[in-house]
Design a protein with these regions (language model features):
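Donor nucleotide-sugar recognition loop
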Residues: 38
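Active-site beta->alpha N-cap acidic-glycine motif
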Residues: 35
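Acyl-donor (CoA/ACP) binding surface of acyl/acetyltransferases
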Residues: 1-32, 48, 63-171
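A short helix-loop-beta-strand connector motif used in the catalytic cores of GNAT acetyltransferases and
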Residues: 51-63
Length: 171
């Protein structure tokens, strides 16, 4: 478990499923991610992937909740999704974050991602990447605040996306 001033990051549990499902089925939340709300089955598969990442890679996604009242904020973490993307990213951990609509605009994404990155830095991971839809200005700002810089563009699912990279702080 990781704690910040306002947040608690922990591995997803079965009890997180309903909150995760509600968030990923919200069209406003997924607008710049896939553009298509997730079904209950797709959210279930996501929860299984999140847990499986930890066993296979030693890192993965955390469930983010507020410390004050335990309210579900969203998901943040890292994966090797083996994306069909040009240029390929090999096995570099890819950061990702998504927040429930109520949590937008409160600095939670930056706070959670900074904590997750500190965890990765502590494990000696030299660099991470993230991909962001060019029109998603909010996520671009979060990435910049967390030390990501524009590496270039990439083609993912036939669309151009921004490819950002971050180097470990203590190198």
């Amino acid at each position: 478990m990781i704690e910040t001033g306002r947040l608690r990051l922990s591995l997803h549990q079965m009890t997180d499923f309903n909150d995760l499902c509600a968030m990923w089925s919200d069209p406003d939340v997924v607008r710049h991610i896939s553009g298509v709300p997730s079904s209950e089955q797709e959210s279930w598969f996501r929860l299984l992937r999140y847990r499986g990442l930890w066993d296979l890679l030693g890192y993965g996604y955390w469930c983010v909740r507020t410390k004050a009242d335990g309210r579900y904020v969203g998901d943040v973490g890292f994966a090797d999704w083996k994306r069909d993307i040009e240029p390929p990213q090999d096995t570099v951990p890819e950061a990702g974050w998504v927040l429930a609509r109520w949590a937008h605009g409160q600095g939670f994404a930056t706070e959670a991602l900074q904590a997750a990155l500190a965890w990765m830095d502590g494990r000696g991971v030299d660099r991470t990447v993230c991909i962001i839809a060019p029109e998603h200005a909010t996520s671009c700002r979060v990435a910049e605040k967390c030390g990501y810089f524009l590496k270039g563009s990439a083609c993912f699912r036939g669309e151009q996306t921004l490819l950002l990279q971050r180097e470990r702080d203590d190198r």
